[in-house]
A protein has these predicted regions:
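N-terminal intrinsically disordered, low-complexity regulatory tails that precede a folded domain
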Residues: 1-132
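Short, isolated positions within intrinsically disordered regulatory regions of eukaryotic proteins
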Residues: 44, 106, 143, 148, ...
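Polar/charged alpha-helical tracts
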Residues: 50, 54, 68, 174, ...
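Charged interaction segments
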Residues: 133-140, 223
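Surface-exposed beta-loop interaction hotspot
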Residues: 139-193
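Alpha-helical oligomerization segments
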Residues: 184-245
Length: 245
């Protein structure tokens, strides 16, 4: 069953993913990335409890402005000596010289979206429902989890094992279409008619992404908003189903 996400967190996490990839490609700067994120939430702060960013004089309990975290990501790689023992083997197998690639993951119970541990980190990602993780390159295994706090966002940077490689755009589109057919069959089984197409516009991924990537996002965005509308009216749907049965 589709899950409801905290309002805005999914969109902001998607935007952070695009900006982190742009930083890695050298097509944007930390200052520009911060400015862009501030259009989505008035303030962003970061907690780095494992000190993965290795910032000088950093208190692992305190939070810091996101600009400092973005600048660190822009100019250096992770300190692998700080990685926990259960992640060490994965880090050794990961090529730090490979292009840094970040992805947005939406783990659910029974489908961890490629996450491979540690268990505690996967559990936190499951609770949040969305996370941004680097699956190759100098920051492989670094994960961002965001939480809405008032009009801002609080981010935690955590050490996970590098995840499984993501699907290609074609594979993602095929999987998405299969899920759409499955959902349509379920709705038909409940005797429910189709509603109106959600009036939504998907975010632009940016110049670093292909037209195929954008097409998959636009389809997924429409489906996601349709699912959100269904979840918002879940009580009415269940009541209607009860009357029919």
């Amino acid at each position: 069953m589709p899950r409801a996400y905290p309002r805005g967190v999914l969109e902001i996490s998607l935007r952070l993913t695009c900006l982190l990839n742009a930083l890695a490609a050298g097509t944007t700067t930390a200052a520009h990335a911060e400015e862009h994120l501030n259009r989505w939430a008035v303030a962003h702060h970061v907690n780095d409890p494992d000190e993965l960013l290795a910032l000088p004089d950093h208190d692992p309990i305190a939070s810091l402005p996101i600009l400092q975290a973005l600048a660190r990501l822009e100019h250096g790689g992770i300190d692998h000596t700080r990685a926990p023992e259960d992640a060490a083997a994965d880090i050794v197998r990961t090529n730090p010289a490979a292009p840094t690639v970040w992805e947005l993951v939406l783990p659910t119970p029974g489908n961890y979206a490629g996450l491979r541990g540690p268990t505690r980190i996967v559990s936190e990602a499951l609770d949040a429902g969305t996370a941004v993780i680097c699956h190759q390159g100098a920051w492989a295994g670094t994960m961002w989890i965001g939480t809405r706090v008032g009009h801002g966002v609080h981010w935690r940077i955590l050490r996970a094992n590098p995840p499984l490689p993501p699907m290609s755009p074609l594979e993602a589109l095929q999987e998405l279409r299969a899920q759409m057919r499955h959902t349509a069959d379920l709705l038909e089984g409940l005797g429910l008619s189709a509603g109106e197409r959600p009036d939504t516009v998907a975010p632009r991924l940016g110049s670093g992404y292909s037209s195929g990537d954008q097409a998959v996002l636009e389809t997924a965005w429409t489906v996601w908003h349709a699912c959100q509308a269904g979840l918002d009216s879940a009580h009415e749907v269940l009541t209607a189903h009860g009357v029919r049965t």
